[in-house]
Amino acid sequence: MKLYRDEAVVLRTHKLGEADRILTLLTRHHGQVRAVAKGVRRTSSKFGARLEPFGVIDLQLYAGRSLDVVTQVDTLAPHGRSIVGDYALYTTATAMVETAERLTEIEREPATQQYLLLVGALRALAERAHAPTLVLDSYLLRSLAVAGWAPTFTDCARCSREGPHRAFSAPMGGALCQACRPPGAAAPAAETFLLLGALLAGDWALADASDERHRRESSGLVAAYLQWHLERQLRSLRHVERA
């Protein structure tokens, strides 16, 4: 396979030499791909502006030994234009693409569900369909679920006892009954558990109707759950403006 086409989200870029950029892409069919875009930093470049983070693109690449080479680009959804000018949207989108990069670290391993989740989340941000923090927390929960780390917010994560329950532990997988609850477990409000379940399921009517107190509490639990499974903190998450 020398030349191939795919859709992609630009996760990250950095400069190479005087005129080139190295791109980290999450593609629809080929997973995470690293590629060089030659000459895109020149003002005469035909597609430099199309290769900014958060954009959804259709591109043709030449498969190289270490880095692929971008040979053609078309814009499918210029979400970056709507996102980069708004601090809340920008920091939220940055946390999303950093998460996507971490969850798809094995290059060229297909990750179509992760790609589709990210595209949908970026679209929701760009269209301001919901509060940015809700979109972020929903994306984080669902992307972790796709990666095999789905939390439970109703039945006990340890013994499967039917809920609802009032304790939460990120290391143990979510909600816990009184018998399984370890010392120091969080005790979120019942409304927070409902919100978390709605965000995981994509129940936007319930999520949009939630109040700020429960949004803040749910965001803290989502961040703890994410950090536990990624085994490190997202650099970008600390900059996100929480409700």
Curated annotation (Swiss-Prot):
Whichever gene encodes this chain, its name is recO
Any coiled-coil ranges, and where?
A: none
Q: Which domain of life is it from?
A: Bacteria
* UniProt family annotation: Belongs to the RecO family.
Q: Name one GO cellular component term.
A: bacterial nucleoid
One Gene Ontology term of the biological-process aspect is:
double-strand break repair
Q: What does this protein do?
A: Involved in DNA repair and RecF pathway recombination.
Q: Which UniProt keywords apply?
A: DNA damage, DNA recombination, DNA repair
The protein's name is: DNA repair protein RecO
Asked if the record carries the keyword DNA repair, the reply is yes
Q: Which Gene3D superfamilies match?
A: Nucleic acid-binding proteins, Recombination protein O, C-terminal domain
